[in-house]
Design a protein with these regions (language model features):
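N-terminal leader/linker segments that initiate helical-solenoid repeat arrays
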Residues: 17-66
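A conserved position within tetratricopeptide repeats
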Residues: 33-37, 50, 88, 122, ...
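Boundary/linker segments of alpha-helical solenoid repeat arrays
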Residues: 40-43, 57, 129-130, 158-170
Length: 180
């Protein structure tokens, strides 16, 4: 029933334009992220970036985005994809809708569609570390360790002091060296 209400709400309004990745706060937040050394402070900055990415003025798309966690909890991935597809039709320049849909495709094992949405996300927001991480995970599943390593090295430029990125790079370096 909830999905029907969300889909109905999407058809009520069609012309809004503010998109997440255009937030004037993001440049400053990414600057802070590139310099932060404290992990708690880093987590706070990352949370603020996600908050900016999630913002959308279109109330119909906002309904979808506000209900993403419900789709995850219920494992209703196909309904999530349908709702996000409608959101993307309403706001085709909203990077986070593509990113969330890519995540649901990934969880369903549909890496091809996930990759398409990751590409759209990164086209709209090249600094989207969530999409970069998703891309790396897909490359790893295809055993393209060198490609995944390159993606994490790009993430490292955005998050130079992130220990989890360091660990992923270290693990991938080992996997790449085993292949040669």
């Amino acid at each position: 029933m909830k999905i029907i209400l969300i889909i109905f709400a999407l058809f009520l309004n069609i012309s809004y334009s503010y998109a997440d990745q255009n937030s004037p706060k993001l440049d400053e937040l990414f600057s802070q992220l590139s310099q932060v050394k404290d992990s708690k402070e880093q987590s706070l900055i990352i949370s603020k970036i996600w908050g900016e990415w999630m913002k959308i003025e279109n109330p119909d798309v906002k309904i979808v985005m506000d209900n993403i966690s419900d789709f995850f909890k219920s494992k209703n991935y196909q309904s999530a994809i349908s709702a996000l597809t409608l959101a993307i039709e309403l706001e085709p320049n909203y990077a986070e809708a593509y990113n969330k849909r890519a995540t649901f495709y990934f969880m369903m094992g549909d890496y091809e569609n996930s990759m398409r949405d990751i590409e759209a996300t990164l086209y709209l927001e090249p600094r989207h570390f969530g999409a970069l991480d998703g891309l790396s995970r897909i490359l790893i599943s295809y055993k393209n360790y060198d490609g995944a390593l390159k993606v994490y090295q790009e993430m490292k430029k955005l998050m130079p002091n992130d220990l989890s990125v360091d660990m992923k790079i270290e693990n991938l370096n080992q996997m790449v060296s085993k292949e040669t």
